[in-house]
Amino acid sequence: METRGRRRAFSHQQDEPEENPGKRPTRSAPLYRHRNQPNANPATLERHYPCSTGRPPTGTVQPKPSQPPQPRSLLDRDAIDHITELWDRLYLLRQSLEKMTMADGLKPLKHFRSLEELLSLGGERLLQDLVKENQHVRSMMNEVTPLLREDGSCISLNYQLQPVIGVIYGPTGCGKSQLLRNLLSTQLINPPPETVFFIAPQVDMIPPSEIKAWEMQICEGNYAPGPEGTIIPQSGTLLPRFIKMAYDELTLEQNYDVSHPDNIFAKAASQGPIAIIMDECMENLGGHKGVSKFFHAFPSKLHDKFPKCTGYTVLVVLHNMNPRRDLGGNIANLKIQAKMHLISPRMHPSQLNRFVNTFTKGLPLAISLLLKDIFQFHAQKPCYDWIIYNTTPEHDALQWSYLHPRDGLMPMYLNIQAHLYRVLENIHKVLNDRDRWSRAYRKRNK
């Protein structure tokens, strides 16, 4: 009864002292203990339990803020592939520039001696820039791929460009007449003409063998191989017409008027595409009689008047890139209106250099010198090859191209070469800055 009637001590009160006054009192009970605490006699806590109710917390109350994704290592497999691919291209371009005969006028560019040195000493920023540069080079290569065949050659010389006004420069014996026939027989002119006008100073100057070669090759260019050994016509006629004309017949007054009933070009244009070939007519073009109408005004009128005339081609042969005699301004106007310049590497170097200097204003000096070196290299070869400049190309990579009798029409990718040269200049700048900082550091710590 005494036990039941005894008052219960509160948790904040100290235990009653024992009878022995000399004995030290025991430690007081904990100030606070959670009801879910598994230990019945826990150690004394000098602070409150962090959780007031429920189970003990398993994590922080406030979630961590979202962090941006960490970038991948620059030396992963894709990055190394990009840098290796770009290194091969840069090495080839650098070797070509160093070995060409005109390399004396170029400033030397600092570079890494090997790919391993680039990967180890290039630095994070430079390696990242090189990866981006190679991705850009790949994109430029992929853009031009639909315009090429499987072997890398061009599908066409003009693609959808109309009218086709071309000038062929070459000395005697470089294969200009054969080039004219090959352009039509290999279907590099799109669409293939149904009527070909061959203009010469005199009709008697054309040998019978050349006439027969023209008739055979324009017929060959009118067909393409089909399935199961068949051939498919590429125009609206089975046999294209070949018409021989003297230069004096070309300049008749009736042929300047599209609406004239006796205009021979209008009659042919009413049936389909036409082509006008002027061979050995440089002296006649330099006379007083103007024929520049056939280069600019005539094509648009034929296209408007005759819907079947979907193609208009004019190819003019010149033996000199800068003839002195041009009384009527025909040659000067022809060069302005020309969309394509087909140049033989056997032309005089002074004329080639003048042409390259005029039409490579947007390219680095090193690429212009490289183009001149290409002309000089092919001038020493016996092949009947040509270098073509297109003023309005389908793609920048096709602005300069190389025509070989066996390989076909191959793009020269001078836009990509110019981009690679700028990458070489960037590497030179990085290495030059490092050398300057190293010299400044050594000078300061002396």
Curated annotation (Swiss-Prot):
Coarse class of the protein's main subcellular location: virion
Instruction: Say yes or no: keyword Metal-binding present.
Output: no
User: What segment(s) does the record annotate as region Disordered?
Assistant: 1-74
Q: Name one GO biological process term.
A: viral DNA genome packaging via site-specific sequence recognition
Q: Which GO terms describe its molecular function?
A: ATP binding; DNA binding
User: Which Pfam families does UniProt cross-reference here?
Assistant: Adeno_IVa2
Induction context: Expressed in the intermediate phase of the viral replicative cycle.
Q: For bias kind Basic residues, which ranges apply?
A: 1-10
User: A single GO CC term, please?
Assistant: host cell nucleoplasm
Where is the stretch described as DNA-binding? 439-446
Name where it's found: Virion; Host nucleus, Host nucleoplasm; Host nucleus, Host nucleolus
The set of disulfide-linked cysteines is: none
| Keywords annotated in UniProt | Activator, ATP-binding, DNA-binding, Host nucleus, Nucleotide-binding, Phosphoprotein, Transcription, Transcription regulation, Viral genome packaging, Viral release from host cell, Virion
Q: Which domain of life is it from?
A: Viruses
Q: Which residues bind ATP?
A: G170, P171, T172, G173, C174, G175, K176, S177
Family statement: Belongs to the adenoviridae packaging protein 1 family.
Q: How does it assemble?
A: Homodimer. Part of a genome packaging complex composed of packaging proteins 1, 2 and 3; this complex specifically binds to the packaging sequence on the left end of viral genomic DNA and performs packaging of the viral genome. Interacts with protein 33K.
Q: Which HAMAP family match?
A: ADV_PKG1
Function, in words: Component of the packaging machinery which encapsidates the viral DNA into preformed capsids and transcriptional activator of the viral major late promoter (MLP). Binds, along with packaging proteins 2 and 3, to the specific packaging sequence on the left end of viral genomic DNA and displays ATPase activity thereby providing the power stroke of the packaging machinery. The activity of packaging protein IVa2 is stimulated by protein 33K which acts as a terminase. May be the protein that pumps DNA into the capsid powered by ATP hydrolysis.
Q: Protein name, please?
A: Packaging protein 1
Corresponding gene?
Answer: IVa2
